[in-house]
């Protein structure tokens, strides 16, 4: 089974983010794919019952209600984060995941927090935070910081996405099915990777393809 890129593309919190190749992170998975029921388990199933009920309405729509799906999933995840994260963050499996992925996870979570705070992924609009530094990351993500809960929220999401994709991969393997992942050859101009080290990218250029029979005007892939 070949998959389109499953990286997070959340840049504007609008339908424009549905383009799967405009990754804001080369590592982070997209919250769109998370199973709320799996995160809630039987213990917290009632907590998100109203949101899950709305899922049936969304599934009956003729097309994908991208913005609405994202809105309701994030609302449900915030409810679950509030009641689960303290215990989860003390578990050995989570601690191992965090330590092994800290190099990208921490900057990604801070980027997501700043994107939400300034309501834009354009880092040039982030005032004192437009230029990346490790000191900024450490300051904002400190457990003593006021911003910590909103940043840790993204740790929580990525950990559960990791568990769920791992489980799906293992299940597919048992059934003799190979998952073939499509990976974009570039990233979103307004993303955590370009924020961390803009010198690695040609930010004044975009990838694409010249005119051919498939696209007579050529293609601009937007990354």
Positions of predicted regions on the chain:
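Acidic/aromatic-lined carbohydrate-recognition and catalytic surfaces
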Residues: 1-198
């Amino acid at each position: 089974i070949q998959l389109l890129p499953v990286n997070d593309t959340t840049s504007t919190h609008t339908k424009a983010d549905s383009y799967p190749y405009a990754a804001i992170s080369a590592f982070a998975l997209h919250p769109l794919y998370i199973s709320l029921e799996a995160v809630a388990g039987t213990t917290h199933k009632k907590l998100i019952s109203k949101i899950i009920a709305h899922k049936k309405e969304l599934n009956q729509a003729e097309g994908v209600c991208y913005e609405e799906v994202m809105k309701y999933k994030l609302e449900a995840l915030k409810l679950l984060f509030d009641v689960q994260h303290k215990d989860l963050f003390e578990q050995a499996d989570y601690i191992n995941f965090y330590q092994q992925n800290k190099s990208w996870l921490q900057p990604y979570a801070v980027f997501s927090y700043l994107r939400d705070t300034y309501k834009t992924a354009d880092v040039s609009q982030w005032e004192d935070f437009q230029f990346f530094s490790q000191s900024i990351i450490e300051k904002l993500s400190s457990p003593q910081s006021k911003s910590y809960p909103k940043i840790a929220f993204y740790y929580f999401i990525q950990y559960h996405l990791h568990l769920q994709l791992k489980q799906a991969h293992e299940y597919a393997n048992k059934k003799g099915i190979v998952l073939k992942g499509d990976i974009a050859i570039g990233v979103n101009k307004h993303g955590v990777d370009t924020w961390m080290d803009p010198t690695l990218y040609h930010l004044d250029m975009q990838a694409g393809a010249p005119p051919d029979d498939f696209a007579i005007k050529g293609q601009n892939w937007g990354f």
